[in-house]
């Protein structure tokens, strides 16, 4: 599979990559090719893609409700895509589900960690999301070598202008 194999998409189709009213996400020609490739292979048109060169990965954002269709039962479709692209694209591929609210998006970004609540606050001139994570899932929310929290910070900044995400422990009140 070649990264140059395009379908009949036009640049005008990129309106779908703009999510929040008044918020424009810039898509480069290279990212556009990744979006087309993802769509052609998995049958789901992603909303956005970010190339994280530091972690050597592509992070695709799909519409709410499209995550299951994109990865397939047991992750089968995504595993097939990774296997087919192993020689052409030496990057890991991650998929996250978009949400119309910044709180919901942060919860999705930290998945599979259990996040019962997210608060968006202003701290000085910064916008900070405080994610309350179930104590047992704190390491899951951060991820191996901080990969998951880095991903969350990149995409929260890109889509909602959230400057930082902090993890707090969620404790359930005891009776």
Regions found by a protein language model. Name each.
Residues 2:
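Acidic, glycine-enriched catalytic cores built around paired aspartates
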Residues 6, 10-175:
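RNA-contacting regions in translation and RNA-metabolism proteins
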